[in-house]
């Protein structure tokens, strides 16, 4: 995931465990995306847990797609419902280890600044500025 690409070299991250993330509610699509990315960033700050991959089985009210985000091997979502502002995802990765993972830039926060969501027939492109 692009956010974790700032924190370390994702090529050094193995998939050893997973964490489920679910975001429900919100005022609009931007707030849903913000809350989801904020929860994913919280996984790193709480454990610290690195996520090079996130898993996708079905999409509600849209065509199945994969997000293309820099440095991610593959990003998949279990469910995304644009009308009810709900995202469910399974995040795969491992605990951050300074002996294994080179330390990059600290990501302080996700921001709403210039956040954009562009829905297309076969994918959704998102643009998010992070505070480093």
Task: State where each predicted segment sits.
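Intrinsically disordered, low-complexity regions
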Residues: 1-132
């Amino acid at each position: 995931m692009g956010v974790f690409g700032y924190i370390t070299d994702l090529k050094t991250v193995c998939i050893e465990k997973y964490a489920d993330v679910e975001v429900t509610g919100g005022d609009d699509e931007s707030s849903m995306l913000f809350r989801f990315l904020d929860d994913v960033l919280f996984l790193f700050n709480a454990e610290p847990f690195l996520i090079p991959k996130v898993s996708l089985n079905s999409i509600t009210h849209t065509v199945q797609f994969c997000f293309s985000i820099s440095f991610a091997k593959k990003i998949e979502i279990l469910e995304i419902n644009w009308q009810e502002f709900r995202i469910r995802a399974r995040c795969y990765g491992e605990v951050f280890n300074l002996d294994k993972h080179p330390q990059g830039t600290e990501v302080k926060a996700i921001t709403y600044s210039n956040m954009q969501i562009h829905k297309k027939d076969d994918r959704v492109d998102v643009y998010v500025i992070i505070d480093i």
